[in-house]
Swiss-Prot record:
Record Pfam families: GTP-eEF1A_C, GTP_EFTU
Protein name: Sulfate adenylyltransferase subunit 1
UniProt-listed InterPro entries: CysN_GTP-bd (IPR041757), CysN_II (IPR044138), CysN_NoDQ_III (IPR044139), G_TR_CS (IPR031157), GTP-eEF1A_C (IPR054696), P-loop_NTPase (IPR027417), SO4_adenylTrfase_lsu (IPR011779), T_Tr_GTP-bd_dom (IPR000795)
UniProt: GTP binding residues: 33-40, 112-116, 167-170
Length: 494
């Protein structure tokens, strides 16, 4: 930012005519990092420089900043975010604050997450819906343990795009060597997380350098993008990659002639005539109608709240999942997962909890397997997990559970664990896959592999006998050419 721009920074920017947004999909991002790295100040600066601050907010900011000005005489931009009284008194972020801003290229939803270790669970909440993480690092302090913890949680929650915002670079006299060392250290750590898409930016959130406007006047050695330029080029995760998913929230029966299944589409798309399967029962039906509040739709996509009407009477209850018949989630009694422990009592080995995913709630036994060592990025064996620990666990269900892996569908691959005694939410988790060493398909005894026409297979799967033993089966739909290749490569005695 130029000296002239800095001098005039306390003046509310003049309003400009609204510009067309080229990408209509908002980018959801979080700011995270350790305590006092400048997360709230950065978002406040973003809001200010993108003209997302209203006149009354600007006046309040000027008033509340009285007596709190820094050495540059600039407002305390963090006050635009820290809304709780406790946050203002302590000068920290506790809750997750969501703010909205836009440029002429796209719109953004940003979550300011707390940096203190005891509020890690709040950070996990903010990360669960984000497409990109802005990880702040104090240029004077480098990578800290909480920095690693937040990066790990963001990665586990499916975030693959990171901006490493090396903040307060002005307090190091714009030290290029320090910036490059921090960038190198983080990239080395990120390799253990499988994160490769990292943009490192030196910046001063307070001065606004490399946030919205270029800081090249102060840092001629940096020729990369600003934060906003990076955000404008980021990609939004799509829920269309998997097949149709609808977690039934309510069965609607306003009259004898109507029966519909209500919920929000969690993946893919659906249209009248599509064949669907109800899980965990395995019953098959066709979609006859898609209804919203006041319309009959010819299609629905992820994010739409709909009422689905089927062409036959089937047993569907709240918590069941209606899915595309040719792209099914995993169903079984045992799954692997990764969790973040959220309560002081942690996760006790072998204890039974309530697991809630979507609108379905089931009893589950949780067995900790390993805990992530944040300093090394390695997994160490563990029998219990305490608050803020990141761990791998084995989930064992009494009845068949239905999930997608979290990296394929956030909605149908995530869950929370509830203590049945206290009703506290003790963990948030992500399904990594169905356990390969458990379940009916691996029981002793012979197995039979069949290759059937799709219509015949649908009839068999709709039978009561098949439905009663659905958790003992594995179904894979392939093309005729793929089936021929499988059988050609199979052993001769199959």
């Amino acid at each position: 930012m130029t000296a002239a721009a800095t001098a005039n920074v306390v003046t509310l920017p003049a309003s400009e005519p609204a510009k067309a947004v080229r990408d209509t999909r908002p980018l959801r991002l979080i700011t995270c990092g350790s305590v006092d790295d400048g997360k709230s100040t950065l978002i406040g600066r973003l809001l200010w420089d993108t003209k997302a601050v209203k006149e009354d907010q600007a006046a309040t900011l000027q008033r509340d900043s009285t007596g709190k000005q820094n050495d540059l005489g600039l407002p305390d931009f963090a006050l635009l975010l820290d809304g709780l009284q406790a946050e203002r008194e302590q000068g920290i972020t506790i809750d997750v604050a969501y703010r909205y801003f836009s440029t002429d290229k796209r719109s953004f939803i940003v979550a300011d997450t707390p940096g203190h270790e005891q509020y890690t669970r709040n950070m996990a909440t903010g990360a669960s819906t984000a497409d990109l993480a802005v990880l702040l690092v104090d240029a004077r302090m480098g990578i800290l343990e909480q920095t690693r913890r937040h990066a790990t949680i963001a990665s586990l929650l499916g975030i693959k795009q990171f901006v490493l915002a090396i903040n307060k670079i002005d307090l190091t006299n714009y030290d290029r060597a320090g910036f490059e060392k921090i960038s190198h250290d983080f990239r080395e750590f990120a390799l253990s997380l499988g994160v490769k898409q990292i943009t490192a930016i030196p910046m001063s959130a307070l001065k606004g350098e490399n946030v919205v406007y270029s800081g090249q006047a102060a840092m001629p050695w940096y020729t990369g993008p600003t934060l906003v330029e990076t955000l404008e080029l980021a990609t939004v995760r799509s829920a269309q990659a998997v097949g149709f998913r609808l977690s039934v929230q309510r069965v609607s029966r306003p009259g004898e002639s109507f029966r519909g299944y209500q919920g929000t589409v969690a993946g893919g798309s659906v249209k009248p005539g599509d064949s669907v399967m109800i899980l965990p029962s395995g019953m098959v039906a066709n979609v006859s109608k898609i209804v919203t509040f006041d319309l009959v739709r010819n299609a629905a996509v992820a994010g739409d709240a709909i009422t689905l009407v089927l062409d036959r009477q089937v047993d569907v209850s709240r918590g069941d999942m209606i899915v595309a018949i040719d792209s099914q989630p995993q169903s079984g009694l045992s799954f692997d997962a990764q969790i973040v422990a959220l309560q002081p009592e942690g996760i006790e080995p072998g204890k039974r909890y309530w697991l809630k995913s979507g609108s379905r709630r089931q009893r589950v036994q949780v067995q900790p397997i390993a805990q992530l060592e944040l300093k090394t990025g390695a997994w160490a064996p563990a029998q219990s997990l305490w608050m803020n620990a990141i761990g791998k666990v084995r989930l064992s269900f009494d009845e068949a559970a239905v999930f997608d892996p979290y990296d394929q569908n956030r909605s149908t691959g995530s869950f929370i664990l509830i203590d049945p005694e206290s009703n506290n939410t003790v963990a948030g988790g992500m399904i990594t896959g169905k356990r390969a060493d458990l379940g009916g398909i691996h029981k002793d005894g012979q197995r039979v592999l069949l290759s059937l026409p799709a219509d015949l297979a649908d009839q068999i799967m709709a039978s009561e006998l098949f439905s009663s033993r659905r958790d003992e089966t594995e179904v894979r739909r392939v093309t005729a050419a793929q089936a021929a290749e499988i059988w050609a490569n199979a052993a001769s005695d199959i």
